[in-house]
Amino acid sequence: MQLAFVLYKYFPFGGLQRDFMRIALECQRRGHQIRVYTLIWEGDVPPGFEVLVAPVKALFNHRRNEKLSAWMAADLAKRPVDRLIGFNKMPGLDVYYAADGCFEDKAQTLRNSLYRRWGRYRHFAEYERAVFAPESKTEILMISEVQQPLFIKHYGTPLQRFHLLPPGISQDRRAPANAAEIRAAFRREFSLSDDELLLVQIGSGFKTKGVDRSLKALAALPADLRKRTRLMVIGQDDPKVFQLQSTALGLGEHVQFLKGRSDIPRFLLGADLLIHPAYNENTGTVLLEALVAGLPVLVSAVCGYAHYIAEADSGLVLDEPFEQEQLNQYLQRMLEDNTARAAWARNGLAFADSADLYSMPEHAADVILAQERA
């Protein structure tokens, strides 16, 4: 079959983008042709992929999205496909991969009423309704149990159109047999002594991921503990505002900001704790990547995958609603207790052996390839 995938932006380090790539490659592995429509493509194009970057420009993102939809529709009219799979919400999809939460719910609960008069709101509300309305034919790949009831509440989407997928952690994130050697080499490279503690926070979109909360928690540590603790923040974002916050808090060389990179498994093995106090997070793939690497996790409860950390007993989950003081206390407790960290690491590795945390691409491909076009 000829399959078409559409997403607004591809870059190698985004969670949505990595999920797209693994699903598309799985469909290709099963013998199907892959075409991709996008506004921005950064990185290599896999052999056999046809990638089409829309030649459209607009002042506002929502207008650019609409132009992409129109340009794609015109191309599909000339060169039809058997399935159209979207990783952002838009009209005309056969299958939608629900990487993002419910826009309408956020608009009603987190925004004031004036927001709903803007063109931006109308665009995203209309595009979400095109996917989730009862009369829509789009099948929905869900990766978060938390969001499904919200879509049903706002749109009355029939239950049978939802397909809940298991997580899709890449096997290269699992701790290898030589994990101790990799950890030692990593810590030598970054000049980390045995008594120093390394926190990592990983993910693009520093504001949403709660980097400000992490910096406050680091600054609140007792002086002797703070002196031997470092934080590395890794992701595709402009760190300027957080660098200013870090300086204002007197953290100096204790904090490093690094761009998104392909050797994340080394950081998961070399660190002592993953901190992830996100404001909102549909899933949080990095939580499970840490779990399967044997890295203890400190996470906010709003993250869709936070329940895995609790089930595996591989770290601590903050209460909801979030309180900075609890984050400060939990961080201090986790850093001071070497025995507990070792136990959380063992628990994560044991959970990684028994739970299905890996088969999302295969399950997604099953749904995509099974759908008959309306």
Question: Language-model segments: what does each one mean?
Answer:
Residues 296-300:
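Short hydrophobic beta-strand element within catalytic cores of glycosyltransferases
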Residues 340-354:
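A short, well-ordered alpha-helix in the C-terminal region of glycosyltransferases
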Residues 242-260:
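Nucleotide-activated donor-binding/catalytic signature segment of Leloir-type glycosyltransferases, i.e.
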Residues 120-143, 149:
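Membrane-proximal helix-turn-helix segments that form the acceptor-binding/catalytic region
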Residues 18-22, 197, 201-220:
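A conserved mid-protein helix/loop that constitutes part of the nucleotide-sugar donor-binding site
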Residues 279:
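Aromatic "clamp/platform" in nucleotide-sugar-dependent glycosyltransferases that forms part
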Residues 39-41, 202-206, 229-243:
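Glycosyltransferase donor-sugar binding loop
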